[in-house]
């Protein structure tokens, strides 16, 4: 008895091959149903299938990574990967609207070749559904290997889409072996052969092609689209200085803040302050910081997070001991109180050419600025695009409401060289992840710079990482 015959008998013995009248995914009724989900409960059989699949491939089928079609082929692909030391990718059948929102998970490089692994092929639709997102991320797909080919047009349909199908077992061979070994009657074989003759080519349901990614606009083009003067100015500064780094200057005193602003000023496009934490604040603080900002050509962003009704925030913005309106180019606000907060801030800020960032998301664990709240912030920004210049955001690429206009700037807090978090719930992401994967524009870095032994050198490192990520995003 050959190894293939033994495998067919094992599949029949565990109940993976059933005869009767079954409706298939394609909609047609079949006298045979093959349920390979059962093999996960038989480790030795799963290992045997995985080893035979790879060994049956011709030398011409070269590949760098493997990807199993969800879901039954995933354990087969996993064993292939582990047994042969071949990197594996996973295709998400349902793309999540949180996290990275990726269709393909795993580590790979553009132009690598991916072998698709499938358990059963009828029309080839499931293989094509997996090939599409793999190709969309820059992988090459030229071969697929399958345990059982039902011989109903899958091979031809895949060939028309540039994929060569390699099959371990043909359905006609399976039925022949089962008849010869006395597992089924002659009538069953005749019935099946007649069915295959009448259903030689099952059409492939239309596979929705992934929408092409919109071209990433550079800061120069986006500056021309911005309706806010401070937004335009920030885009221009980022271009001229080649930096998308914002320093979160959360230090203990005004003296420290002015000192570090002067040290890292050449590396940043934006300096973020929390003026109400400075015990030595004096009325001339704003003019001193303004002089440093003008010297090093960066903008000042007071992270006040206004949240009250329109009339109150107007007074908070213009008055009090801090007089934020006098020296801060940019402020930010929550939208919890509704659009009236923007009206109030706009009343004072617009005549001075100031800009507003809306808090669409936050970087702290368990925060409530998600989903509908984020969508509401986008809607308010759209209605006030002459004053609202962008957002404080964490993962704008995943927003359900869709990516907002390129005229809007996204600034993301919680950035460090290494992913992680702190004891108070702050979540950190890397510059590359924030810019290329999460769709942001500006990295906001605090403790990673101000706690460094040499803040200026460290700021330069962040600047290089952030800017290189921006250039990479523009080249995609």
UniProtKB/Swiss-Prot annotation:
Pathway: Pyrimidine metabolism; UMP biosynthesis via de novo pathway; UMP from orotate: step 1/2; Pyrimidine metabolism; UMP biosynthesis via de novo pathway; UMP from orotate: step 2/2. Its EC number is 2.4.2.10, 4.1.1.23. Signal peptide: none annotated. GO terms for molecular function: orotate phosphoribosyltransferase activity; orotidine-5'-phosphate decarboxylase activity. Disulfide bonds: none annotated. The active site is at residue 305. InterPro entries: Aldolase_TIM, OMPdecase, OMPdecase_AS, OMPdeCOase_dom, OPRT, Or_phspho_trans_dom, PRibTrfase_dom, PRTase-like. The keyword Transferase applies. In the N-terminal section; belongs to the purine/pyrimidine phosphoribosyltransferase family. HAMAP family: PyrE. This is Uridine 5'-monophosphate synthase. The gene is PYRE-F.
